[in-house]
Swiss-Prot record:
Pfam families: Profilin
SMART domains: PROF
Lineage: Eukaryota, Viridiplantae, Streptophyta, Embryophyta, Tracheophyta
Role played: Binds to actin and affects the structure of the cytoskeleton. At high concentrations, profilin prevents the polymerization of actin, whereas it enhances it at low concentrations. By binding to PIP2, it inhibits the formation of IP3 and DG. May serve as a modulator in pollen germination and pollen tube growth.
InterPro entries in alphabetical order: PFN (IPR048278), PFN_euk (IPR005455), PFN_sf (IPR036140), Profilin_CS (IPR027310)
Gene Ontology cellular component terms for the protein in this record: cell cortex; cytoskeleton
Full protein name: Profilin-A
Classification via SUPFAM superfamilies: Profilin (actin-binding protein)
């Protein structure tokens, strides 16, 4: 299965009539493996900072998580495994696997819990596959 298929069918899937605003699978080095059409352009240092927060949980808390034009307030995640961010009625979930970051961005009417479920389910599957 291609990385784009994972994004299109597993991240951008419909959940109770709603779906993520955008999603991507990005290598630990910041290289985009696959993304949805609306996924924001981001700066390399934004991915570097996300990776640093996985290595040093709490690194992003003082400054926020930046991805493209958006700044998210970092909220409770799972140290070393999941980073969650909030902005207004939307937010972001980033799940780290052995080789990649699975990123989902949502806005109302999708809920944070639905975003977490979609992103973490694919992330957990990739971890099980050794990816």
């Amino acid at each position: 299965m291609s990385w784009q298929t994972y994004v299109d069918e597993h991240l951008m899937c419909e959940i109770e009539g709603h779906h993520l605003t955008s999603a991507a699978i990005v290598g630990h080095d910041g290289t985009v493996w696959a993304q949805s059409a609306a996924f924001p352009q981001f700066k390399p240092e934004e991915m570097t900072n996300i990776m640093k927060d996985f290595d040093e949980p709490g690194f992003l808390a003082p400054t926020g998580l930046f991805l493209g034009p958006t700044k998210y307030m970092v909220i409770q995640g799972e140290p070393g495994a999941v980073i969650r961010g909030k902005k207004g009625s939307g937010g972001i979930t980033v799940k780290k696997t052995g080789q990649a970051l699975v990123v989902g961005i949502y806005d109302e009417p999708m809920t944070p819990g639905q975003c977490n479920m979609v992103v973490e389910r694919l992330g957990d599957y990739l971890v099980e596959q050794g990816l």
